[in-house]
Amino acid sequence: TAEKHDSFISPTDGGNVIMEFSGKELVKGEPDASSFPSGGLRATFEARGYTAWDPTSYAFIKDRTLCIPTAFCSFGGEALDKKTPLLRSMQALNRQAMRVLRLFGNTDVHCVRTSVGPEQEYFLVDKEMYDRRKDLIFCGRTLFGAKPPKGQELDDHYFGVIKPRVAAFMADLNEELWKLGVLAKTEHNEVAPSQHELAPIYTTTNIATDHNQLTMEIMQKVAAKHGLVCLLHEKPFAGV
């Protein structure tokens, strides 16, 4: 995901400044798209990309900033992100599902929405140990090393007691996610050593996707406050 911050300041004819946020700014923004490959067909300053407001996803406040979820597309409407294809896929599913329902004589349903509740698995590593491993720092996973003294052969970690340090991290994580409207519901150890999981309540697909991006970001920030590092790679260690 990405961010672009705009202030609400707007100059007046008298040389003063007022706080203003227009509907035009809300509906469409114009960030830079020069980092996308163009084959050298256009100059950097002409590489326009446009943000389009996604009114179906909730706005939220993060670090005293109003965050408005948007899609990112080119001047011609081509998708420059992964959210635009998702929204179009949801519309396509709705159209075809409605068509099938009408074939069966169902005229009561007016919209079909998909929902998802993505579980987010993660590993917690002590910051001091993490700093000793350059492969973890640069790759987010180990590239070499000895086998661990304990693997995931038994169920003692999955069904074991959550360690106090991890429990404190989970409590702070839930608090921060709830502030952002992310409905974190379930947390527990996972099978591999140092692996844990957070599961939210199911919600509409595009909202759940936005929430999952927020979850991963907040996980890493909260972990740092507890002297930990959150690894989001699905298999950061060999044999996991």
Task: Give, region by region, the residue ranges found by the protein language model.
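Glycine-rich, acidic/polar active-site loops that bind/position phosphate-bearing ligands
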Residues: T1-L232, G239-V240
